[in-house]
Design a protein with these regions (language model features):
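Small-residue (G/A/S/T)-rich helix-start motifs and N-terminal tracts that mark the onset
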Residues: 1-85, 116, 169-171, 177-337, ...
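A glycine-rich helix N-cap at a beta->alpha junction
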Residues: 74-87, 97-107
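Short coil-to-helix leader/linker segments, especially the first N-terminal amphipathic alpha-helix
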Residues: 95-105, 204-213
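N-terminal beta-loop-helix "entrance" segment that forms/cooperates
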Residues: 90-99, 264-268
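Internal gly/pro-rich beta-alpha loop/helix module
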Residues: 114-116, 121-207
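Short beta-alpha junction loops
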Residues: 86-89, 151-153, 321
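Feature captures the FAD/FMN-dependent oxidoreductase FAD-binding
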Residues: 96-101, 111-120
């Protein structure tokens, strides 16, 4: 999966509000649909490279985008067919359908596929999984190059439900802004490469996609000390901590100390039995501390987490170390990076509500920390 960097991310409700605000400012919704359809047509034109295109249109405005794309592709001379699930039900989609002069085939078991399929069936308004009979019909078209309009049909745009689409996309054309489904697993794995089409909607988004991190190459005067020391505290199961130490080296740390283990996957990792862990925390060369991977809950972990917090070093907390640190994180004055998986998150933040974005934000605010979830 691939998404553009520094792009706005809006929930389906926020997207509808942005569209309404755009219309109130003087841009008609039909103009927005024309722009969306043009973006889809451009993508299909490039991907098809002269091959025939099949556009699947739903009854709503997502289908309207599909009818616009079909018309524009036909005007360019493309070999394009349209198949519809049902007649249009919105005024915008009806108007777009009326401008399409070609035939409209039914979506059933006799529908023949083309090398490129545009999925304009259901967009951000989907509130339930697709019907099983439609799923079966669409799965027969899945072994093609699929372009999804906004989100693959069958995906929950807000990423709250783990619905599996029958037509996973190779490319998804996100309209106006990214949606949570484009960046959150498992939905994101069905979106393929995400292209953001700016259709003229002003997006006052407080959530944006991050650019890929760029690590600078070591300079001629670089050495292990000025590139930073990483201290990883290991528990009774050192495998995960050893992997964290190895990842730190690969990410650019000058060197890594694995405290509390007797082996490491890389010879470059310094292995210590952990007896001098607190002394290591006082080492001015230590630029970051990682604690929690493979470290079971208990008094030993509680003590080691408390020592790490007291050191005031930049801190990464994982697994049971998150639980051990929660009282002090919630008390303020302590900042960390928290890396829980789903089960660890639910255990640490059982009252968090909403989708994944809302829950992660609530956890970050409650702890004053960065939450990678």
């Amino acid at each position: 999966m691939s998404v553009p960097a520094d792009a706005p991310i809006l929930t389906s409700r926020a997207m509808r509000d942005a569209e309404a605000a755009c219309a109130a400012s003087g841009t008609s919704l039909s103009e927005l649909m024309d722009r969306a359809g043009a973006a889809v047509a451009d993508t299909a034109w490039r991907m098809a490279a002269g091959a025939p295109v099949l556009i699947l249109c739903g009854p709503g405005n997502n289908g309207g985008d599909g009818y616009v794309a079909a018309r524009l592709l036909r005007e360019r001379g493309a070999n394009v067919r349209v198949a519809a699930l049902a007649p249009p039900t919105t005024d915008l989609a009806k108007a777009a359908r009326a401008k399409w002069a070609g035939a409209v085939e039914p979506i059933d078991e006799t529908l023949a596929a083309e090398p490129v399929v545009v999925d304009a069936l259901f967009g951000v308004g989907l509130t339930r999984p697709l019907a099983s009979n439609l799923t079966g019909q669409l799965q027969a078209l899945a072994f093609r190059r699929v372009i999804a309009v906004d989100v693959p049909s069958g995906v929950d745009a807000d990423g709250k439900h783990d619905w599996v689409p029958p037509l996973p996309a190779h490319v998804t054309v996100a309209l106006g802004a990214l949606k949570p489904a484009h960046v959150l697993l498992p939905a994101a794995q069905h979106c393929g490469r995400v292209l953001l089409a700016g259709v003229g909607i002003a997006c006052d988004a407080t959530i944006r996609s991050l650019p890929r991190p760029r690590a600078s190459a070591p300079g001629v005067t670089s050495h292990k000390f000025n590139r930073g020391m990483m201290l990883v505290r290991s528990g009774a199961m050192p495998g995960a901590a050893a992997l964290a130490a190895a990842a730190g080296l690969r990410a650019g740390a000058g060197y890594a100390v694995l405290s509390g283990a007797n082996t490491a996957p890389l010879s470059a990792i310094i292995v210590e039995d952990g007896a001098n862990y607190r002394e290591r925390l006082g080492d001015k060369r230590v630029g970051a501390v990682v604690i929690g991977p493979g470290y079971p809950a208990g008094m030993a972990l509680d003590r080691d987490v408390a020592s790490a917090i007291d050191s005031a070093k930049p801190l990464v907390l994982d697994a049971a170390a998150i639980d051990a640190a929660l009282p002090r994180l919630r008390g303020g004055g302590v900042t960390a990076i928290l890396t829980p998986h789903e089960g660890e998150f639910v255990r640490a933040f059982p009252g968090a509500e909403g989708g994944k974005l809302e829950r992660a934000l609530a956890a970050a605010r409650a702890t004053g920390s960065v939450v990678i979830y």
